[in-house]
């Protein structure tokens, strides 16, 4: 059993409870928690004790309280906290994003099915999102392939549990991470279309180079602006070559 509750702890009659979270429809699981459907939202049930989560740099109540107040468009932030019977922070809800890139058959939508204009919109939103992270003293961390979701609006980012809070000078770190995210969109799409060992090595070197480049995103935006109706799949290989 995994009983959790949400609401005002001092007023038990007003608490919403989930007797066993593992009875909910599963969305997925990772090294730090389990994700389920709940009332039109996604709810993440956290692994480990609060102390161990803090030691591992995972989600803590302090981090939750910081991130839930950061207003973003593309980065999925937590909304409500759930607690155990002993009033320990144990789970949180967040907006549910339907990831069409993981669908099979007719419902599948690949990132390559979107347009340069969609990619540009995502970049502009992410730039604003990262400005909000900077203001809050938060640095994005531990971005991997599972962090990328693709709904009908193109790119969304999840897995904020290892984001770092209380950073005094986050701007440069976040710029590098924003570069990394945008470069990885291109990288993963090229991999999807096929890449031999030589090409893979070149792509990895390109990723390392772009992460610390101040010109990468401005140059990419200019290229995307010129051909907003071009399919990403049609021009993906030129994006890494010309930037």
Segments the model singles out, each with a brief description of its role:
Residues 117-131, 135:
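Amphipathic alpha-helical segments that line or abut small-molecule/effector binding pockets
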Residues 151-243:
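C-lobe/activation-segment region of protein kinase-like
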Residues 1-18, 55-59, 224-243:
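Regulatory N- and C-terminal appendages and interdomain linkers associated
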